[in-house]
């Protein structure tokens, strides 16, 4: 652990030197007067100088290394009047401000564009997508309201496998390889069984940062991607409520102050409560009687609670609790159910006279899932964790720093039916200790972000060093060349296989015991999964809000662990194979096997929005392969081409009408073809004789894995919204939507013996009403 101590000492020395520099600084938080919410992406500038910054997700800003003297500070944001104040700074002074923006009847679109450009000027955009509530609402809401799961499907590099139990695959990574955070706590199951709904209520979201590759050192423990969700606080000025009903379900929100924020004292306490759920399992047969026999047997309930404390200087404490649940019940076939409960606290503080921002958090979570099938003993999985973290932030004009340390205690338990019907149980405990350092250095046209992560896996006694690097070169004010890369590790394993097109149940393991000890003739002592990323891209900021990006990426998953679908023997023999190891023998006897993976491709994106319209186009060209002990194959989510076109515009009197559309075109997924059918005769017990009076079952002779391709997939989703402003606070909105508007018959699966075909969801009209009070 000497490496962790060294990183901590270095970071604290840097933080100390930053806190006692010889130049003046201005720091603070920006709020809006209506609800007391923080204002991310507000433009903070010193007029007549080059000093400026956009507020971060916490509404925080720091203008550092300023000369002493007089300055005119300006803060601006869309829909608000500019805030201006005159400041006299003394040498070595750190001035703390609480800024409250007042609403304006004049829409200054250039203020938002300026803030967005300031934000983009301070980041490397390689494989990073910032989603705001405005962006999330650009997608037609298939359930009557916008959802994060629907927007993720249009991000280049993300593949979604279907409406019924579909999963998200990010540039060759599987769902278990995606790290999902909610206000700092890890969410292991963020999406419901019905594929277009997440556990997050869009109206509680402040921002979402999606990294599809090459993410920085503060994130780890996963091989593929990061989805970092931040929620807002409750209204700090007045009590509000929001309720919506639609053909799929409902949503309820209540919020307000427990201690009101006032102009004289910004200190406050507020609450935010959210509940959303579904009733489509009950209403589906009545509203959509033309659905096939599988219907929509889904049910979910999500609860979210947050209490936020704000001090007079902007310091913040959040207490958060969640409970998510999901059920998919196919009578006579299977029943999958899971619940996820979590809670904890987060502290954000910037001490007086300090130029750094401190953040700490502690959370506990409990995830439980079960799968019940006829003639098979129930499968269960438990994932329990306790995580604590501490971070130090510094944002300067030419140098920024983020140092953090974390401790995660994880417990997994998985029960399943073994090869002879015996109930098997695996239970593991582990502790993960980690520390990381991210820096950002601006030198001329270059912005360089080196980072390093130390991750210790206690159950493996393994200490991993993971270097990360981002580089941006500004060709001009509008054109940037970007690079991002690094090395990543993961201990968590799922019981799903790359051969499973749909799997509503995932078991979780930390350090599986029943796994190969050799892979392709090489002995493997350490069972940590490993990957490397590299991304090279270019971005262009055009007139107004036009953004164009192009990226080439490669992900080398050079050690992965997959659930073994080839197991046919008990794990009792220790016989070496032809290579002198146990790899081939383990390929047929172990519950888990090693694999290698490779993903590479090209992603293109164009994004353009005006006052009353939006246009978004994303195209992905991707290649994914897997290699196990014996064969190289493509997994079922290897989609070669994927195109998404999204558009929307507002019209009518007061622009109260809104129309949105999304069209998705994708090449066919791989599948394993059938060569023929045969009579499968069972042997009598304890001998090789067959019963001459017994008829065999119908067996399938399979072709090599995933060498066939399904037909092309395409679908159009539409929505039309009308908003009525009833009073200052009261607003009524009606939404009519069409999923799969032209009723494209996209294949879901076919029964190999009866040749019955089941398609993805047909045309589904939806209707929703929402009322804000």
Model regions and ranges:
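Periplasm-facing N-terminal accessory domains of Gram-negative outer-membrane beta-barrel systems
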Residues: 19-110, 114, 118
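Periplasmic N-terminal accessory/gating domains of Gram-negative outer-membrane beta-barrel systems
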Residues: 81, 88-91, 110-216, 226, ...
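Short strand-turn segments of transmembrane beta-barrel domains in outer membranes
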Residues: 196-198, 206-217, 225-256, 273-277, ...
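Transmembrane beta-barrel wall of Gram-negative outer-membrane proteins
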Residues: 248-279, 290-327, 335-357, 394-401, ...
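Surface-exposed extracellular loop regions of Gram-negative outer-membrane beta-barrel proteins
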Residues: 368, 413-416, 458, 478-534, ...
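Outer membrane beta-barrel strand-and-loop segments of large Gram-negative receptors
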Residues: 385-391, 426-428, 432-436, 527, ...
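Gram-negative outer-membrane beta-barrel transporters
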Residues: 442, 554-556, 575-670
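C-terminal beta-signal and adjacent terminal beta-strands/loops
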Residues: 664-689, 693-697, 709-717, 721-773
């Amino acid at each position: 652990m000497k490496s962790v101590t060294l990183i901590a000492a270095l970071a604290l020395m840097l933080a100390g030197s930053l806190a006692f520099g010889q130049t003046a600084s201005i720091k603070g938080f920006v709020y809006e007067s209506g609800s007391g919410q923080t204002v991310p992406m507000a433009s903070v500038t010193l007029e007549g100088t080059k000093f400026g910054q956009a507020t971060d997700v916490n509404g925080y800003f720091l203008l550092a290394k300023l000369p002493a003297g007089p300055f005119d500070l300006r803060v601006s944001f869309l829909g608000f009047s500019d805030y201006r104040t005159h400041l006299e700074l003394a040498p070595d002074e750190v001035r703390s401000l609480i800024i409250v923006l007042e609403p304006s009847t004049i829409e200054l679109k250039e203020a938002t564009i300026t803030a967005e450009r300031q934000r983009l000027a301070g980041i490397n955009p390689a494989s990073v997508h910032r989603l705001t509530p405005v962006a999330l609402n650009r997608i037609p809401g298939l359930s009557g309201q916008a959802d994060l799961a629907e927007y993720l499907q249009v991000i280049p590099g993300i593949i979604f496998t279907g409406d019924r139990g579909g999963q998200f695959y990010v540039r060759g990574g599987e769902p278990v390889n995606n790290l999902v955070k909610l206000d700092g706590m890890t969410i292991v199951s963020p999406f419901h069984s019905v594929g277009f709904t997440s556990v997050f209520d869009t109206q509680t979201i402040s921002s979402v940062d999606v990294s599809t590759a090459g993410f920085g050192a503060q994130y780890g423990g996963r091989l593929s991607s990061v989805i970092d969700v931040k929620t807002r606080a409750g209204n700090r000025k007045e009590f509000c409520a929001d309720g919506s009903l639609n053909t799929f379900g409902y949503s309820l929100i209540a919020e307000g102050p427990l201690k009101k924020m006032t102009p004289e004292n910004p200190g406050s306490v507020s609450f935010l409560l959210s509940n959303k759920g579904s009733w489509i399992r009950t209403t589906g047969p009545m509203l959509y009687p033309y659905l096939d026999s599988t219907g929509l047997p889904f049910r979910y309930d999500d609860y979210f609670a947050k209490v936020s404390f704000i001090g007079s200087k902007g310091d913040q404490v959040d207490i958060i609790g969640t409970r998510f649940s999901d059920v998919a019940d196919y009578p006579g076939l299977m029943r999958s159910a899971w619940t996820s409960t979590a809670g904890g606290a987060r502290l954000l503080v910037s001490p007086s006279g300090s130029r750094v921002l401190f953040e700490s958090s502690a959370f506990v979570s409990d995830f439980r899932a079960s799968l019940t099938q006829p003639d098979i003993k129930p499968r269960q999985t438990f994932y329990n964790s306790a995580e604590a973290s501490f971070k130090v932030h510094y944002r300067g004009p030419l140098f920024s720093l983020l140092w953090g340390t974390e401790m995660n205690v994880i417990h997994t338990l998985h029960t399943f039916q073994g090869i002879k019907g015996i109930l098997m149980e695996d239970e593991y405990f582990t502790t993960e200790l980690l520390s990381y350092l991210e820096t950002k250095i601006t030198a001329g046209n270059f912005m360089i972000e080196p980072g390093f992560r130390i991750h210790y896996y206690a159950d493996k006694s393994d200490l991993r060093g993971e270097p990360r690097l981002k580089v941006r070169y500004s060709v001009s004010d509008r054109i940037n060349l970007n690079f991002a890369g690094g090395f990543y590790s993961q201990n968590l394993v799922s019981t799903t296989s790359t051969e499973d097109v749909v799997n509503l149940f995932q078991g979780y393991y930390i350090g599986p015991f029943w796994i190969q000890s050799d892979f392709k003739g090489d002995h493997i002592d350490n069972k940590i999964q490993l990957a490397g990323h590299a991304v090279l891209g270019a971005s262009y900021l055009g007139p107004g809000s036009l953004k164009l990006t192009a990226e080439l990426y490669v992900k080398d998953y050079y050690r992965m662990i997959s659930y073994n679908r080839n197991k046919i023997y008990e794990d009792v023999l220790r016989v070496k194979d032809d290579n002198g190891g146990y790899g081939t023998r383990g390929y047929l006897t172990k519950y888990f096997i090693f694999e290698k993976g490779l993903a590479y491709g090209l992603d293109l994106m164009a994004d353009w929005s005006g006052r009353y319209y939006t246009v978004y186009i994303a195209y992905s060209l991707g290649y994914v392969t897997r290699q196990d002990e014996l064969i190289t194959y493509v997994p079922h989510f290897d989609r070669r081409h994927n195109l998404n076109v999204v558009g929307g515009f507002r019209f009518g009197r007061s622009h109260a009408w809104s129309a949105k559309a999304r069209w998705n075109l994708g090449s066919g997924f791989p599948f394993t073809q059938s060569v023929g059918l045969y009579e499968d005769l069972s042997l009598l017990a304890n001998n090789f004789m067959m019963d001459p009076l017994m008829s065999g079952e119908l067996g399938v002779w399979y072709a090599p894995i995933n060498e066939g391709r399904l037909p092309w997939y395409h679908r159009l989703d539409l929505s039309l919204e009308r908003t009525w402003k009833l009073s200052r606070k009261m607003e009524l909105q009606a939404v009519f939507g069409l999923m799969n508007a032209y009723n494209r018959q996209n294949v879901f699966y076919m029964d190999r013996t009866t040749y019955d075909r089941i398609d993805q969801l047909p045309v589904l009209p939806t209707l929703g009403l929402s009322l804000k009070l």
